[in-house]
Amino acid sequence: MDADSINSFFLIGALLAAVSVLLSPVSSRLGIPILLIFLAVGILAGEDGPGGILFDDYSTAYLVSNLALAIILLDGGMRTRVASFRVALWPALSLATFGVAITTSITGVMAAWLFDLHWLQGLLVGAIVGSTDAAAVFSLLKGRSLNERVGATLEIESGSNDPMAVFLTVTLIAILGNVDAELSASFMLISFIKQFGLGIFLGLGGGWLLWKLVNLSKLAEGLYSILVLSGGLMIYAASNKLGGSGILSIYLVGLFLGNKPTRGRHSILNVLDGMTWVSQIGMFLVLGLLLTPSDLLDIWLPGLALAFGMILFARPLAVWLSLLPFKSFSSRDRWFISWVGLRGAVPIILAVFPMMAGLPGAQLYFNLAFFVVLVSLLVQGASLTTAARLAKVELPPKPLPISRSGVEIYPSSEWEVFVYRLSENKWCIGEPLKRLSMPDGTRIAAVFRHNTLLHPSGSTCLEAGDILCVLGQEKSLEALSNLFSQAPETKEVPRFFGDFFIDTEVKLLDLAPIYGLELDEATGDMTVADLVAAELGSHPVLGDQFLWQSLHWVVAGLYEGKVTNVGIRLPAEA
């Protein structure tokens, strides 16, 4: 490649990336996933589009996609709170293993019938499209205030179900590539254990070593993110090299680092945020360039049947069967999880495996994977907001600071500065600072008024439009935001939790005459907390609800995992 070709490559690449970024606001206006915009730009620039760029280098696409996916998973792991595992780990693992196997089997049978394939070839198609995609799930759920049990289950599933899909895909390719090979139970069991076992061991072990290395190093601030990124990629590659799941490993590395006091954590997250956007744009641009839309015309009708069969039948059946042991999921939760079986880059990456292995019919597998991904993003991704509203799993948005930044005085420092702008309707307007009930361990460090810095004292009175810089830790964020911030306006806020709020220490006997409750010996001595535990189990989450004696009871407040208050909706409002 000469200098002119290199410059042309840079020019075209930068132009496509810039166009993708500038078109990103269109996704919110049209209600379609932003990843679809990036993919569309790549397709339009490709062989069948106005750009006319001929790109058929599957090895390069495989390299770019794996690198991008690794970065996305590292960032996603660092932003996942380990506390969410309390309510979502086992359901997510059930979906990541049994769910993928069930989806693969049903989709494989449909593919074999629709495309007149051998049953093993059909199963290979099912394995390729059998797992949800972490990049798509993290991107579309980011910033949404979902029921914690549902949101965490979807995120953990998407970060941990790829080993099962890779295991099934690689196994079936080995069998189809060797006519003498057999489906040995011991061979499959060993491969399965290697994928998950090595992935978990290297992810957690490597994450611990990388965490120690980061905290012991004294580097320029900008170098910590490079150390984390390079270390994560080393663990990802080592896991893949040894036969484990690199995808699972790097997700666990991010999870470990994100939930430990890590030096430079905030600057690392800021850099990774930008890297994740670059990765998403680059990955979907390259995959879009790789696709020749005219190749999909021959398979569009059976392809639609396969995609909708997976969306409407295979995925829901897999979810309902996988979640049977977990009674805490309501029917609405299960339907929403079924609908958010988003496919994205991973199926396309897996579809490259048969191409690189030289299997007969590999182009069909690739085209089918691409077709299923397009339908999934268009149908499931575009309807995500509507589905969340209908399933009632989206919570009213929480009040948050307008910005937050770390105060990394010590390697293990968890101090942050939260910035709030006071609106006119906050009760603290006109009140002196000494009368505010601030959470323990927090302090107002500065007050800005009309672009002027004030030196706050106990007698300083707050005014509308004041900007407050508050020093505190993440554990105090909810209390501080409720005190100073303003949640985004939405019509659903007043109705979601109900019009009446009850402290969980109140006895049902005291509520009986007010709400017409009929109590017996078993319920007469119960408190509201006892009722919630009896109906929802030991791990309720915000927004959980149940129907009892014609009233809708909604978990409206939690503190350290304990329900503090409950909202009540009357029958006419439910």
From Swiss-Prot:
Membrane-spanning ranges: 6-26, 34-54, 58-78, 87-107, 109-129, 173-193, 196-216, 219-239, 242-262, 271-291, 299-319, 335-355, 359-379
Q: Which reaction does it catalyse?
A: K(+)(in) + H(+)(out) = K(+)(out) + H(+)(in)
**GO cellular component terms attached to this protein's record:** plasma membrane
GO MF assignments: flavin adenine dinucleotide binding; potassium:proton antiporter activity
Query: What SMART domains does this protein's entry cite?
Result: CorC_HlyC
* Keywords in alphabetical order: Antiport, Cell inner membrane, Cell membrane, Ion transport, Membrane, Potassium, Potassium transport, Transmembrane, Transmembrane helix, Transport
**Protein's membrane topology:** Multi-pass membrane protein
Q: Does the keyword Coiled coil apply?
A: no
Query: Which intervals hold domain RCK C-terminal?
Result: 405-486
Q: Where in the cell is it found?
A: Cell inner membrane
Chief location category: membrane
One Pfam family of this chain: CorC_HlyC
Entry's Gene Ontology BP terms: cell volume homeostasis
HAMAP family found in the cross-reference section = NhaP2
Q: Which NCBIfam families does the UniProt entry name for this protein?
A: PRK05326.1-1, PRK05326.1-2, PRK05326.1-3
Q: Which PANTHER family does UniProt cross-reference here?
A: K(+)_H(+) ANTIPORTER NHAP2, NA(+)/H(+) ANTIPORTER 1
Q: What does this protein do?
A: K(+)/H(+) antiporter that extrudes potassium in exchange for external protons and maintains the internal concentration of potassium under toxic levels.
| Family in the record | Belongs to the monovalent cation:proton antiporter 1 (CPA1) transporter (TC 2.A.36) family. NhaP2 subfamily.
Q: What is this protein called?
A: K(+)/H(+) antiporter NhaP2
